[in-house]
């Protein structure tokens, strides 16, 4: 590596400072978006959990053969809904989901099962497309304008149709979820079939109620909401975790830039000192030569 002049080093320091200003601004933007996203997430989680509890309770109470979405079959064909971000600059946020998905696909294929993917998020599409995976549907650029129940109803309709018509025997959902402001985890959740957790205390309580028009009709409506809202929650969870991951990544980048500035400033001072020393020696030598 060629030795840099003080001017080159100074230019390099200025470039790092410019980058630091950008990462600092991106951290501030991500922090603001994170606060807004957390408010939406805090409103989404309780409804999602209560909806699941209702379906779980009713599924214990009814004949599972009354609705195709409740039927449990041997798993020969499996669909995986993969949720990533559209953008990068968020550390290992997207790579965690992709790595987990690859592991799940390998596990299922080694068990002799056919695996199909539904991709949500540009990073998932970019990675899995044209690599030999069976892709049923792919969606990009959905977080800005399409992160709503209208979009999840569209995807949910595909999932429901495939399960009802036995095109798939199980559906898994893989996405990142926010744990704390500084941490997130990649979750693998089974959407279908719904396998209720038997609670005979609850079963006794439910049997006391008269459900109108009938438990079957109520359950059918809830199942539609369940698919759509679980997908919606996955998008909200992923979006919130993405903002947190990007905020952390930009904070780390800002700090790393600060450390780099310190190191290059020391190098600059040494180079300038060497240049001054060299000039002084040249002046002294010239003076001695004149004498």
Curated annotation (Swiss-Prot):
GO BP term, pick one: proton motive force-driven plasma membrane ATP synthesis
Transmembrane feature ranges: none
Gene Ontology CC: plasma membrane; proton-transporting ATP synthase complex
Topology term for the membrane: Peripheral membrane protein
Subcellular location field: Cell inner membrane
GO molecular function list: ATP binding; proton-transporting ATP synthase activity, rotational mechanism
A Pfam family: ATP-synt
SUPFAM superfamilies assigned: ATP synthase (F1-ATPase), gamma subunit
CDD domains: F1-ATPase_gamma (cd12151)
The family this protein is said to belong to: Belongs to the ATPase gamma chain family.
Name of the molecule in the record: ATP synthase gamma chain
Source species of the chain: Persephonella marina (strain DSM 14350 / EX-H1)
Gene: atpG
């Amino acid at each position: 590596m060629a030795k840099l002049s003080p001017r080159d080093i100074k230019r390099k320091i200025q470039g790092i400072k410019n980058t630091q200003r950008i990462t600092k601004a991106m951290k501030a933007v991500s922090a603001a978006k994170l606060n807004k996203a957390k408010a939406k997430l805090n409103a989404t989680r309780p409804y999602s959990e209560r909806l699941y509890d209702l379906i779980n309770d009713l599924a214990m109470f009814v004949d599972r053969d009354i609705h195709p979405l409740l039927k449990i079959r041997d798993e020969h064909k499996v669909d995986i809904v993969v949720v990533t971000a559209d953008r990068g600059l968020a550390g290992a946020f997207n790579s965690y989901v992709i790595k987990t998905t690859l592991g799940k696909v390998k596990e299922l294929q080694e068990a002799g099962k056919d695996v199909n993917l539904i991709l949500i998020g540009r990073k998932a599409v970019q990675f899995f497309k044209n690599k030999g995976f069976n892709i049923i549907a792919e969606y990009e650029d959905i977080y800005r304008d399409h992160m709503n129940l209208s979009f999840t109803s569209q995807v949910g309709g595909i999932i429901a149709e495939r399960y009802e018509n036995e095109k798939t025997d199980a559906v898994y959902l893989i996405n990142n979820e926010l744990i704390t402001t500084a941490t997130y985890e990649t979750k693998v959740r089974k959407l279908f079939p719904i396998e209720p957790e038997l609670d005979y205390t609850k079963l006794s309580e439910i049997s006391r109620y008269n459900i109108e028009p009938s438990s079957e009709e109520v359950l059918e409506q809830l199942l539609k909401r369940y698919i759509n809202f679980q997908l919606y929650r996955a998008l909200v969870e992923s979006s919130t975790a993405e903002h947190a991951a990007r905020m952390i990544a930009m904070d780390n980048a800002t700090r790393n830039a600060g450390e780099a500035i310190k190191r290059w400033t020391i190098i600059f001072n040494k180079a300038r000192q060497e240049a001054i020393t060299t000039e002084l020696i040249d002046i002294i030598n010239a003076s001695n030569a004149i004498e």
